[in-house]
From Swiss-Prot:
Transmembrane segments: none annotated. One of its GO terms (cellular component) is nucleus. It comes from Arabidopsis thaliana. It holds the Pfam family SRF-TF. The gene is AGL93. This is Agamous-like MADS-box protein AGL93. Probable transcription factor. The keyword Amino-acid biosynthesis does not apply.
Amino acid sequence: MDSSMSTKKKTKLSVRNQTCFKKSSLSSSSTAKKTTNLSMREQTMFKKALELSTLCNIDVCVIYYGRDGKLIKTWPDDQSKVRDMAERFSRLHERERCKKRTNLSLFLRKKILDDTKLSEKVLEMEDSLESGLRVLQDKLLLLQPEKNQTEFGQTRAVSSTTNPLSPPPSLIEDHRHQQRTEPLMSGVSNTEQDLSTSSLSQNQSKFSVFLYNHDNCSFYQVPDSVSSFDSLTSTGLLGEQGSGLGSSFDLPMVFPPQMQTQTPLVPFDQFAPWNQAPSFADPMMFPYN
């Protein structure tokens, strides 16, 4: 039992020693890694300073301090140049120092503000363009009737130019007005013609036809049949004449109460019987009541 217990204790101690050794080895390896990483960063920083000084043709210095505040390394290696550049920078005004300094937080904030202002300006410009477009649309709506009238006038002018035989619009309007008024005028003329014809027939019923002999100064009355025939014939002829005059001058026809010829014809006997054929003589018409 004692031997077994002693072996167990030895194994536990050996395990503890191994774990302690592992921890120390891990810590030393992590420290070495940190050191290498730091040295690589130092080399990268000094390399960038050299490139910046060469490409931009400016004075660049790097001052590297340790954790305890001791100076570890400078670039360039000549510390007098580094001291000179540091003194010149310290003598600058705060405003001049800010020009040479870049704050990322301030830069980003300024960038955001600039973008916001730009977006606001774009919105204002868009609103102004939309308002101008509305004004132009309203003007186009107001000018549309005038444009239509102008195009209609130009079309009429072109049509009259291309067709010189076509009458002008004023003559067309006069013709249309004449067509509208012609039925009324024809109705009036027809009424006047009917009235003149009826009055003529009434007046002619009161006339008798006599033949006058210039030799013995005698009269011969034409029979009623011949008188009515001549009356109807003269009525038709004078009716046509009266209608022609009415349609031409729109005036009522006036008939003379007495008509006679001036040139004598052949003589005839006053006392001849009624059935004897009379000679041609001057016909005369006398009214009677």
